[in-house]
Amino acid sequence: MDLKAYFELIRLKNCLTAGFGALISGLIASNFTFGALFPLILAFLVVFFICGFGNSLNDIYDLKIDRINKPFRPIPSKRISLTDAKVFSYSIMIFGLIISLFNIYCFLMAVLNAVVLQKYAKIYKKNKIIGNMLVAYLTGSVFIFGGIAVGNVNVSLYLFSCAMFSMWAREIIKDYEDIEGDLKEKVSSLPIKYGEKSIYISLGLLLIAIGLSFLPYLTGIFGIYYLLMILICNLMFLAGFFNLLNAPSKKQARKTSKNIKLITNFVLIAFIIGSIFK
């Protein structure tokens, strides 16, 4: 068994990132209570396995395209057979669902996300207008999952909302970058439908995320240290975005997309600081 190939199939780095997102969100929601550590370790494992399931499914359904565009991937390179990939992907999904039974609400959300991942891989990768929304939800859901695991979703809801809208904006920008390839593959996306106007739709979603990011301070959950850091993050968001508005191009779209992903990590740090220094 080629472990490296299976790690590549599930996209190990993405699975670890998602798992740690749930873990950190749960720690914030529990005010870093030691007793929350065990359910959060379980939450980490659930998110890791369900994310791995989704990533594996993407490779299974993309086999025809990957034979041409990405022949080095585990399945087209025949390091993993298609049958073995299917057995493996559904096995880790089952493992994830079994572990999620430690909390009925975690179990229900794990089932929901597994279904969404299945539908996305099978149907909505070609329809990015809906697909982007699903990816945004899935990204944000890891944070609310951590809150559910410790029985407190108040802060996690803010993290979920900010992450969902900022990632939704990012997905549209990525589509703007990929517009030529998507046209060839007959994929529907907002940039294909609306051209440069789609950048303003993306900006609108980002502004919603920015507006929501102030709520933890305005509602008294976090204090001035959170506010200062979130202000810096939001200014960085806007500065990068206006560069794209002033000079829309594939290169600038790629840069803006990377910036949003990076700054979202700083937003998570702002939530950590806010929860520690109230």
From Swiss-Prot:
Q: Does the keyword Transmembrane apply?
A: yes
Keywords on this record? Cell membrane, Lipid biosynthesis, Lipid metabolism, Magnesium, Membrane, Phospholipid biosynthesis, Phospholipid metabolism, Transferase, Transmembrane, Transmembrane helix
What domain of life? Archaea
Query: In its keyword annotation, does this UniProt entry include Cell division?
Result: no
Q: Where in the cell is it found?
A: Cell membrane
Q: What class of enzyme is it?
A: transferase
| One annotated Gene Ontology cellular component of this protein | plasma membrane
Q: Kindly tell me the pathway this chain contributes to.
A: Membrane lipid metabolism; glycerophospholipid metabolism
> Which GO BP terms apply?
glycerophospholipid biosynthetic process
Q: What is its EC number?
A: 2.5.1.42
Q: Which family does it belong to?
A: Belongs to the UbiA prenyltransferase family. DGGGP synthase subfamily.
Name listed for the protein in its UniProt record? Digeranylgeranylglyceryl phosphate synthase
